[in-house]
Structure formats: C-alpha cells, structure tokens
Amino acid sequence: REACKSILPLRQCSVSAAELMDRNALRAVENEPGMPETLRTLPDGAVALLIDTSADDEVTLQKQFAEIAEKLSDVQTLYPVSFTTDPELYATYWRVRSGLFTSAAAGRPRGTVSIIEDIAFRGDVLGDALTDVREVLARHRYPDAVMWGHLLDGNVHFTIFPDINRPEGVEGYAAFMQELTDTVLRHDGSLKAEHGTGRNMAPFVRQEWGEDIYRLMKDIKKLLDPRNLLNPGVLINDDPQVFIKNLKKMPLANDLIDRCI
C-alpha cells in the first residue's frame, strides 16, 4: 500500500518506467548470481520499485533524480531513494525484473502449474486494491503467488501455482477466480489490461461489463464474424465453466522436466 502512494507523484516526473516487485518476486531471484545483497535482507511484505529515467545530458539527468526523490519524500521506504548511472549496476537491477517470472515459475511446487493474469486499477485506489488482492490470494492458499507490475499504468501481473491434478485443486482455483473478479470490480478495476482476454477470464466479462454492453459485444462479434471463426470462445463465451475445462495437467516426471513452465 505504501509503495503505491508513489504512482501519482511519479506521473508528474520524467519517468519512463516504474516497476513494482513484491517480496515473493524478489525472493525468487535473490539467490541468482549478481543479485544485490540487500534483496535477502528484506522483510516479508516489502516491495521494490525500479524507476527508470533518462536525459540527453548529465545536468538534466541530475535534476530529474532530484525531482523524483523530492516527489517521493512522503513515501516511507526501508532504504533511501537512490539512483545510479553505472551501466553494470542498472543492468543488474533490470535483470532482477526480467528474471523474476521464470525464476518463480521454475521454483514452484512440483506437480503444480503456473497461471498468470494481469489486472489494473486507477492510481488513487491501487494500494488498497492490491492489498485486498493479496488477501484473496492468501485466503485461497496461494501465499507463494508472485506479483509485479507497471506502476505508472496501475497494471499488475501475478502468477499462482495451483495443483490442477486434483479435483479439489481445480475447485479451489475456480473459487479464487470468482473472488478475484469480485474484488477487482469492487475497486472499479479492469480484469484485463496489458494482455488480451483469454478463455481463463472470458466467463467473467459479462459480470465486468454488465448485460447490456455484453449483449452489444456479442452483436458486434456476430456481425463481424458470423461463422465464429476468429478466436472462438476467447473473449465472448457463454460457458461459465470454460476456464476450468481442458486444463493441461502437470504429472510428475523428473526434477528437470517438473521445472518447465
């Protein structure tokens, strides 16, 4: 919640990226070669914010550093806001960001699958919304879920590791998706942001947009694709159970294969 207070101030600065990474995301990469030592010292509940800014000259760049630090002065941090112009150091920081999903998914419990989704919220509610989403994840026994996102856009990704080899695992996942939908919509958020609506989220489009708009979507689909040849069932799908059908299970094989995503 505290980290999300930075979204509105950062939008007033010359910032090209502000990447949010939760503690589970950082934990997934903290033991990789070249990772900053500070990652291993972070407490549970901590998050990191990777800010990228650039300029054509050193004077302008230093001014931008100062402006960003000033805008974030009201945000409580575990470590002081700091910047670097060392190419090797900032490349290390970006390796943290780029490697977190694959590292987290490869380290998931054996026999589970990795399911990734992305949601979005307005900047003024992002902190409260993500806190609630994290509570939903915990209630549905996904405490190891990994969360990261593009803070400036209010867009957050998360990946969970359900065991769909068991019927109760599928039932638990279905219950989670419904409560996730309810939580996102309660905060006036979007069930999709950066990526398209696939079969996993299709059953919840009607709830998100309401009957009238959903009916209009279906009319447009029928008009432009009367034979339903283009991505059938991906966005418009009247089967409320489609997201838990034809799931690709992950039987145990060997230690190497079980890490595949």
Q: Where on the chain are the PLM-derived regions?
A:
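Noncatalytic alpha-helical scaffold of FAD-dependent oxidoreductases
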Residues: R1-A193, T197-I261
